[in-house]
């Protein structure tokens, strides 16, 4: 199940990349002005935020009917893939409303492939193996991030119908394989009655606040600062080969770091990864040579891989058992809110304003370090809650 989720996340993320590459052209075909494209991306993130949390909670309510949940995930995915496949065909019809409607259907149903599969991993993968499973889950996203710049170059002049069709078919096939694995293992790894009470209250609140800070820090560091940072020291034609450095670090460390998460716990390793990422982001912001910048970006990506894998493992542990989908859905929703905020800043042209540039330079490091302190507190609170049932 965990291995299948790697492929699901890979094809889901690659589909998003294909969508972003072709959205300006599709919007123009549908009669939407170019200025509306960022607003469509903003709408997507708002839908992700709402649906990720809602579907995660739904997965908790269906905890006793795994086969029914598997069927629901597959059905939602088939609807999502169908809508995605239709996008390059409905755009030439020249109807902005139709393009937006199909996009909304795709965005809403694709959320079935984030929190619900994680909830299933939380129930069906034994606790000690969950960090490794979380690493596999996130590795698919990391691989997609690494190949995205090359995909942008390769698809620049291609007919959009073929990439959309290949992405939709690949995602549907991977999801069918994953849901088959769910049906083959319908019983939880640990009986419900023998598992400790979920950790609620202060540790979860501190964890989610840290996730919000980490998500915002990542959006500023990679989506806003990375390309301009490289262009300070490198040629524009080298950018597609430099941007994947972050994701190479992410992919190389994510599975080895899961071994440390297994031993020390998700919040503790998130705190370590956040602190390391904050320091690496500070070096990136002040790098005076391309070599230093590349090395710092590599370590920033490695730290982010540790953070994200540990965050998923921590969400599953905090939600155990019966609330895995709720906590995992909240995590994904907050990451979508972070992306929403970044797109809103771009629409407002904040990154182009000279007064904001120094703030954007040091903000990722500051937010990641602050999140590290919060997570250290969350780890302490979690240990107290595990030993004292009176802890809120």
Located regions from the model:
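A late C-terminal transmembrane helix in Major Facilitator Superfamily
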Residues: 322-352
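A membrane-interface helix-boundary motif in multi-pass transporters
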Residues: 69-70, 153-170, 346-371
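Structural signature of the two symmetry-related core transmembrane helices
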Residues: 69-86, 268-283
């Amino acid at each position: 199940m965990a291995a299948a989720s790697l492929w699901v996340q890979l094809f889901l993320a690659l589909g998003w990349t294909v969508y972003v590459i072709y959205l300006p052209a599709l919007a123009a075909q549908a009669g939407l002005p170019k200025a509306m494209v960022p607003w469509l991306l903003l709408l997507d993130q708002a839908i992700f935020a709402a649906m990720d949390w809602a579907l995660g909670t739904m997965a908790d309510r269906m905890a006793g009917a795994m086969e029914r949940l598997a069927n629901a995930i597959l059905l939602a995915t088939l609807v999502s893939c169908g809508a995605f496949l239709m996008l390059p065909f409905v755009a030439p019809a020249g109807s902005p409303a139709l393009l937006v409607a199909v996009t909304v259907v795709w965005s809403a149903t694709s959320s079935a492939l984030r929190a619900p599969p994680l909830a299933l991993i939380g129930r069906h993968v034994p606790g000690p193996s969950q960090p490794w499973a979380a690493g596999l889950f996130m590795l698919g996203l990391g691989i997609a991030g690494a190949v995205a710049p090359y995909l942008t170059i390769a698809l620049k002049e291609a007919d959009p119908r073929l990439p959309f069709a290949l992405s939709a078919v690949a995602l549907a096939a991977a999801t069918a394989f994953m849901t088959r694995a769910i049906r083959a293992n319908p019983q939880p790894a640990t009986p419900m009655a023998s598992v400790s009470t979920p950790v609620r209250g202060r540790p979860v609140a501190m964890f989610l606040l840290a996730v919000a800070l980490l998500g915002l820090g990542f959006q500023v560091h990679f989506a806003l600062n990375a390309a301009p940072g490289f262009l300070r020291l490198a040629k524009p034609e080298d950018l597609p080969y430099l941007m994947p450095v972050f994701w190479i670090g992410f992919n190389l460390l994510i599975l080895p770091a899961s071994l440390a998460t297994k031993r020390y716990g998700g919040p503790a390793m998130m705190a370590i990864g956040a602190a390391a990422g904050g320091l690496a982001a500070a070096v990136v912001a002040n790098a005076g040579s391309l070599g230093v910048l590349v090395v710092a970006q590599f370590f920033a990506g490695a730290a982010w891989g540790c953070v994200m894998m540990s965050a998923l493992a921590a969400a599953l542990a905090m939600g155990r058992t019966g609330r895995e989908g709720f906590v995992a859905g909240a995590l994904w929703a907050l990451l979508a809110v972070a992306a929403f905020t970044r797109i809103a800043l771009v629409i407002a042209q904040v990154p182009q304003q000279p007064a904001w540039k120094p703030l954007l330079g040091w903000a990722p490091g500051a937010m990641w370090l602050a999140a590290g302190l919060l997570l250290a507190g969350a780890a302490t609170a979690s240990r107290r809650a595990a030993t004292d049932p009176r802890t809120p």
